[in-house]
Amino acid sequence: MKLIVFFCLVSLGLLSCNKSGGSTPALLTPTNLMVNVTVMPDNSGNVSFVATATNASTFEFDYGNGIFESVPSGAVQYKYTSSGNYSVKVTAKNGLGASISKTVVVPVIVSLGLVWSDEFDVAGAPNTNNWGYDIGGSGWGNNESQYYTNRSENVYVSGGTLKIVAKKEAYQGSAYTSARLLSKGKYSFKYGKVEVRAKLPAGVGTWPAIWMMGDNISTVNWPACGEIDIMEHRGSELNKITSAFHYPGFYGGNAKVNTTTISNATTEFHVYKLEWNANVMNVSVDDKLFHTLPNNATIPYNQQFFFLLNIAMGGNFGGSIDPSFSTATFEIDYVRVYQ
């Protein structure tokens, strides 16, 4: 009997003893893992997974986007929020932790729906339900030379586009005027696709921007709130487009920046796009990707953000202003958000 007991102890992972001195199989390592995947054909992002295995009591799904889920039955439906080829790892486990895994690549196409837009199709002042204004001429932390107003001389809608006009004129102690619109307190969102169709102003010293700031800027300040520069442009670099991400540790001159070159930036309309989710942020012009930032929970890009549209003059980015500059117009055809 002592020999039998000793055998049972050293063989615990393989056999168990019964009263008659025989043995019965213990929980065995899972085998025969099969994963059936059904991608819904409506481009909704919904995917059905059915996993089966011998000797498995639970199934863990790594959806390939940083999301994990444990499912006892092995059957689960998951909704992806953006298109991509996702490497999904399925692990079948038994009660003792023994496991077997399989990885399948799941191609997903997600058709996003338009959830908010301003088409700028009503002439006059911009829609006050969508836009407010920053007013003043304090340099705005960048040694800028303009005074921002909400006057019709500096901002108006006509012919189906928003016009932001920078002018050389003495006003409130500044040598230039312009406008800066923002959707703060009126519209903000987290994740999705942004498209802005715009024609940039011409003139050395102009600094137009399409950008976003975190809703919590009033409580945590910049750069803790995060900043997304979808498009910035120096008038001295006619067709060079800049995108930047500012956040703690990487801001100002140390921001995450990239550039691209396009044709006719100031004479033709181009579509500036941000694709933003919990895993990545992609910026493109006319569907040409040129700037990417991996997203994660340690940086401030998992909260509500609002829009800003403006022309600055000079400053740390815009540089020296051409003495012959008189006026320049930033035209925006639409701002659209898809989710």
Please describe what each predicted stretch is:
Residues 1-16:
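Sec-dependent bacterial lipoprotein signal peptides
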Residues 17-50, 58-63, 70-79, 83-96, ...:
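GH16 jelly-roll
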